[in-house]
């Protein structure tokens, strides 16, 4: 179970993968013709709301769901007709799926019984797995005698002793408390990097996706909305759905008045603004500015600014609709000439009350333009 002896990570390809369920109202496309390449050794997260198809896609990769149409290949070899137990993959489930009547050691070694390994190798793999997860001292305990975090580590050890090419995670942190979730996501990411595993992680938690992933696949209604590195997904969303799902965003309507290479001059209620945006927009296109709450400084956090113009930050007056203290930050919903915006200030600053007039400054460089008709599902 050392880095040197772990099975080589696998590269996965999905081509026009579709899953159709029969329902009383007719056929339901849970996953609709998705295409995806996952490089060996990468941590990839399927992110989206409930019912978007992320878990169904994971289960098709694992072999727990049949593929209605399309192809899934691992290192160039088709998996479609390969049963789950023959696929070089391990899955960590949301419920951990530990056997209550088996000790930790026997739970970790359960899958190895089907590999018919020599006894000495089996024992060594179990010992390595327990050591890797730091749970050797719990080897003879039963699951009910463990905390949630300890059970999670047992489930991880059980997956890793199989020496998979790919490890699959089906929302494994959702049953843990907030503090333990933070610790476990750091441990899982560090372990994946140490072993060089290919990992596919399913979650609806944007923070998990942003902090753990090499690549994020944002899904909605059975389709892929956007694939990219975390910073790209967050700062350069392709449409309103992605922008809204990743963090807190407001939207300001505008029209493209000039194309300037890879930037646009956009006429908005905030003035004419030079900003970057989704490629391919043209003069006259109706667009929306994506305005992130953390880039909208309120009150004392609004810096001094020269007279507003297309190249400067945006200064505007607003009326506080609602405000809340959230520890390190104050959060605001604001009524402005450009519509409703959300903003932030430092938690040590005064919390402005509803109805107060405040000054806000929006960082122009943080603005991003998307098509006005981009989907919000």
Model segments located where?
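ABC ATPase nucleotide-binding domains
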Residues: 82-241
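The feature captures the beta-strand-to-loop junction immediately N-terminal to the Walker
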Residues: 47-49
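Conserved coupling/switch loops of ABC nucleotide-binding domains, chiefly the family-specific signature
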Residues: 68-71, 121, 221, 253
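ABC ATPase nucleotide-binding domain helices that frame the ATP-binding cleft
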Residues: 55-58, 154
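Helix-to-loop junction immediately C-terminal to a conserved catalytic motif
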Residues: 62
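Conserved ABC transporter NBD signature motif
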Residues: 70-78
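Non-catalytic connector elements of ABC transporters
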Residues: 249, 259-377
């Amino acid at each position: 179970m050392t880095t040197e002896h772990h099975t080589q990570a696998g590269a996965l390809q999905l081509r026009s993968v579709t899953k159709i369920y029969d329902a009383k109202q007719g056929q339901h496309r849970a996953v609709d013709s998705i295409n995806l390449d996952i490089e060996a050794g990468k941590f990839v997260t399927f992110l989206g709301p409930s019912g978007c198809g992320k878990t169904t896609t994971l289960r098709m990769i694992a072999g727990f769901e049949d593929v209605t149409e399309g192809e899934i290949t691992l290192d160039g070899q088709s998996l479609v007709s390969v049963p789950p137990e023959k696929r070089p993959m391990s899955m960590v489930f949301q419920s951990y799926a530990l056997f209550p009547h088996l000790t930790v050691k026997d739970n970790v070694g359960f899958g190895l019984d089907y590999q018919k390994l020599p006894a000495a190798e089996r024992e060594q793999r179990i010992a390595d797995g327990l050591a890797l997860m730091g749970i050797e001292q719990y080897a003879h305990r039963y699951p009910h005698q463990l905390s949630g975090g300890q059970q999670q580590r047992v489930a991880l050890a059980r997956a890793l002793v199989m020496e998979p090419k790919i490890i699959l995670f089906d929302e494994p942190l959702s049953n843990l408390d907030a503090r333990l979730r933070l610790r476990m996501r750091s441990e899982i990411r560090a372990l994946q990097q140490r072993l060089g595993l290919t990992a596919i992680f399913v979650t609806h938690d944007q923070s998990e996706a942003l902090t753990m992933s090499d690549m994020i696949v944002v899904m909605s209604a059975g389709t892929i909305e956007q694939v990219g590195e975390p910073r790209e997904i967050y700062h350069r969303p392709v449409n309103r759905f992605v922008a809204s799902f990743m963090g807190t965003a407001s939207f300001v309507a505008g029209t493209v008045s000039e194309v300037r290479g890879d930037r646009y001059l956009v006429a908005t209620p905030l003035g004419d603004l030079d900003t970057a945006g989704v490629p391919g927009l043209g003069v006259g296109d109706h667009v929306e500015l994506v305005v992130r709450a953390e880039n909208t400084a309120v009150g004392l956090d609004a810096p001094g600014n020269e007279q507003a113009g297309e190249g400067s930050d945006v200064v505007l007056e607003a009326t506080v609709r609602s405000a809340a203290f959230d520890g390190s930050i104050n959060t605001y919903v604001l009524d402005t000439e450009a519509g409703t915006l959300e903003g932030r200030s430092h938690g040590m600053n005064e919390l402005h009350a509803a109805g107060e007039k405040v000054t806000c400054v929006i960082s122009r460089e943080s603005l991003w333009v998307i098509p006005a008709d981009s989907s919000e599902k």
